[in-house]
Structure formats: structure tokens, C-alpha cells
A protein has these predicted regions:
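Domain-level signal for soluble alpha/beta catalytic cores
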Residues: 1-291
Length: 291
């Protein structure tokens, strides 16, 4: 895995482009709603490979492996918790096969839906879940880790503890948050990001936030608290649920790219897209950054 120092050299050279949405684009490719994304991808690998090749062609430098909910506690719903390490390793290897010229981040996410509290017993459970997933991600050859769509500081602390125990060198932390910089738990994000910096995070920021005129300001607020590279991976605006039951986004790629350029000007060093974005959004962002 990359060290924090190697990762920071990459961020110092230029703005780093991440990828866009995975789940919503896989649904467009035929993945049924409500299924286990991780197992569906292993059964239909070409759908993921096609999507990630498009991202690489658009300029993506870091691909997120499709391991979003590949922790034991989530895989248990499919009776697959015993295969946690193997599933994560296979999914990372699948993303690694897309290109030799990009980095692959092992993707972890919130486990808030699986716990009623963050007392000592539950915190230890989260750490063990993340440890098993991280082992698989490292076995598969992940270059770094990304813990994204986090909702609570305790989740980030559990990931950080697990990463340290497993010897993972480079981990980014990304929260979903309000435009004013508060988490959905009500706590202010800034001090939490500062504590993650002190704990050895490689980058911090946000994702799954609706891109709008306030997004660049959110980048500015977070930069007051940290010297780390700030990650910005918002949605393509606000979704509308269609008659097909899927979320639809009206923001165009050029509109999104304009906002991302402003986020870059406010100091964001890692730019990508979340729900509702695709390779066209990444390509438009790349063009906006180079004009």
C-alpha cells in the first residue's frame, strides 16, 4: 500500500481525479434494486469493468473498488460473512485489472444501521468487522483505503483503529454532512477531521452531499480545520424518485464541473462524483480544470 507520504506527494503535484458513482450506474447496467452489489458484481464482472474503464478514459486516477458494504456484518444477510476476506480480495483484483495506470482504493462505509449505540462492546464489534474487510482489501492489492459516507465520528475512529491494527498505510475519510459542515449526528465535522489528521489520516472530506452553490463554501469551512488534502465527491444535485423507483438527477455534467472547479479553487485536492454522476461528469470536471 501507499504510505501517507507517497500519497501526499501525489496530491501536491496536481488535483487528483476520483471516479463517479458505482451503484446507480450498475443499476442502469441491469443490477436489480436491493440485491447484494458485491456478489452481483462478481457474477457480472463485465458491467463493473466497462464502467471503470470509462472512468479511466475520462481521467480518473483513483478507482474505488466495489466493496462498499463487504463487511461481515452486512454480508451476513446473504450468509456470506465467512467469505468476507475472499470477496474483498476478488473485488479489488477486479478493479486492479482495469488499468495499470490508476490506483485502486478499497472502499469501506458506515455500519450505523447495524448498531444501536457506540458503547465499548459495539465499538469492538465495528473494529473487528472493519479489520476483516481491510485484510481482504490488502490481500487483493489495494493501494489505499477510503472510508466513505460515514455518519458518525465513532465509525471513523473504528476504521482508524482497524487500519492501524492491520498495518494499512494510507486511509482517506469521507463523511456525508450538511452544507453548514455538521454531520447528520449533529456534531460539527471540522474538529472531527482535525482529530483524524492527528490520528494519521491521509485525506479527509465529504461525499454524497448534493452539489450546489454552497458546496465550494463547505470545502472552505473544512480547510480551516485541517492541512490534509480535502476530498470532495458530491452528488449530481438533489434526486427525484421516478416511477421506476430509481433516483434521477437533473444536474448536467457541465453544471457539476463548474461547481467542482470552484471547489478546487477553494482548496479541494481530490475531486470526484457520487450518486447520479458518471464518466461524463468526470470528463467534464477534468476539462474544467485544464481550461
Amino acid at each position: 500500500m501507499l504510505t501517507r507520504q507517497e500519497f501526499h506527494k501525489l496530491c501536491d503535484r496536481s488535483t487528483v481525479l476520483l471516479d463517479g458513482a458505482t451503484g446507480s450506474n450498475l443499476q442502469k447496467a441491469g443490477m436489480p434494486r436491493g440485491c447484494c452489489t458485491e456478489t452481483w458484481v462478481l457474477e457480472h464482472p463485465e458491467a463493473l469493468l466497462c464502467l471503470q474503464r470509462e472512468y479511466v478514459q475520462a481521467g480518473t486516477q483513483i478507482l474505488y473498488a466495489p466493496t462498499f458494504q463487504a463487511q461481515p456484518i452486512a454480508l451476513a444477510r446473504q450468509g456470506l460473512e465467512g467469505q468476507t476476506e475472499a470477496i474483498n480480495a476478488k473485488l479489488v483484483q477486479l478493479s486492479r485489472s482495469v488499468s495499470d495506470n490508476v490506483l485502486v482504493a478499497g472502499d469501506l462505509t458506515t455500519l450505523a444501521a447495524f448498531t444501536d449505540s457506540f458503547d465499548d462492546a459495539n465499538f469492538d464489534l465495528l473494529v473487528e468487522n472493519y479489520r476483516r474487510q481491510i485484510r481482504g482489501l490488502m490481500d487483493g492489492g489495494a493501494d489505499l483505503l477510503i472510508a466513505e459516507t460515514l455518519m458518525y465520528a465513532e465509525e471513523a475512529e473504528a476504521v482508524a483503529t482497524a487500519a492501524e491494527l492491520e498495518g494499512a498505510g494510507c486511509c482517506m475519510y469521507s463523511f456525508t454532512m450538511q452544507p453548514d459542515g455538521s454531520l447528520f449526528s449533529g456534531r460539527e465535522a471540522g474538529p472531527i477531521l482535525k482529530s483524524l489528521e492527528e490520528a494519521g489520516a491521509a485525506a479527509v472530506g465529504f461525499n454524497c452531499v448534493a452539489a450546489d452553490l454552497s458546496t465550494p463554501g463547505l470545502v472552505g469551512k473544512l480547510r480551516r480545520y485541517t492541512k490534509l488534502p480535502v476530498l470532495c465527491k458530491p452528488n449530481a444535485g438533489v434526486p427525484v424518485i421516478g416511477s421506476d423507483g430509481l433516483a434521477h438527477y437533473d444536474m448536467s455534467a457541465p453544471e457539476f464541473a463548474k461547481i467542482m472547479l470552484q471547489c478546487c479553487q477553494m482548496g479541494a485536492r481530490l475531486l470526484g462524483g457520487c450518486c447520479g454522476t458518471d464518466a461524463g461528469f468526470i470528463a467534464a470536471t477534468r476539462q474544467a480544470l485544464t481550461e
